[in-house]
């Protein structure tokens, strides 16, 4: 995967029974991961403040049709009859809408074509995050989002504000081709899945 043309979006969905062990989901403004050389450390900087401004809209079932259609197509493309993948269409949809918010022109049109041409992908994602992220007596559901941006790029503040306020997302700046960045991303996933997913990324992103 090429790092120079990609902002890496991580979205996790966690469903656990309340009898399971619960970890601390809080995060600091920076994540420092030791490198193989104990005398050096690489710092991953958080670019966003955690400020959630929810948009609660009384959506009808028809409003969620783009999400349902996206989920069906995602499973259709992923199931080949020989494997049994674990997929979260909601996580994939939210991650893509986060990325789509930073696009414009023809690229933005492609995101809308994929995610539903209703012009409301941002508020729809925000509504799902707020509706679904509630604990019940026997169930805990957690949606967590983050964006990892290579340090050769400077993201627009407007996009950072959007993903922070509407997606409750954190954005991190790092050299994505380093093992330290890979370790930090894996640690983020581990922390936000209460240790159920310990390693999502097997190797650093390609520097070219």
Please tell me what each predicted stretch does:
Residues 1-9:
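Bacterial N-terminal signal peptides that target proteins for export
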Residues 85-92, 96-103, 200-208:
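Active-site-proximal helix/loop microenvironment
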Residues 23-25:
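Bacterial signal peptide processing site
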Residues 49-58, 90-94, 108-113, 163-172, ...:
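Acidic/histidine-rich, surface-exposed loop or edge segments in extracytoplasmic proteins
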Residues 17-21:
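C-terminal motif of bacterial Sec signal peptides marking the signal peptidase cleavage site
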Residues 34, 38-41, 82, 125-208:
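Non-catalytic, conformational "gating/processing" segments within enzyme and secreted inhibitor domains
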Residues 52, 101-133:
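Active-site-surrounding "flap" and adjacent substrate/cofactor-binding loops of secreted or lumenal enzymes
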Residues 29-67:
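N-terminal low-complexity, Pro/Thr/Ser-rich intrinsically disordered segments
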């Amino acid at each position: 995967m090429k790092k120079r043309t990609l902002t890496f979006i991580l979205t996790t969905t966690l469903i656990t029974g309340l009898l399971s062990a619960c970890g601390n989901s809080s995060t600091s403004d920076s994540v420092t991961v030791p490198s193989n050389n104990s005398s050096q450390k690489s710092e991953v900087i958080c670019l966003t403040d955690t400020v959630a401004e929810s948009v609660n809209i009384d959506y009808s079932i028809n409003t969620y049709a783009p999400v349902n259609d996206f989920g069906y197509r995602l499973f259709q493309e992923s199931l080949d009859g020989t494997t049994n993948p674990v997929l979260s269409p909601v996580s994939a949809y939210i991650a893509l809408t986060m990325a789509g918010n930073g696009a414009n022109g023809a690229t933005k049109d492609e995101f809308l074509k994929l995610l539903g041409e209703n012009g409301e992908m941002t508020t729809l994602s925000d509504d799902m995050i707020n509706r679904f992220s509630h604990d019940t007596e026997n169930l805990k559901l957690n949606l967590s989002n983050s964006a990892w941006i290579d340090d050769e790029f400077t993201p627009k503040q407007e996009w950072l504000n959007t993903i922070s306020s509407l997606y409750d997302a954190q954005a991190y700046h790092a050299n994505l081709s380093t093992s330290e960045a890979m370790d930090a991303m894996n640690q983020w996933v581990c922390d936000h899945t209460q240790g159920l997913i310990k390693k999502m990324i097997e190797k650093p992103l390609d520097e070219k």
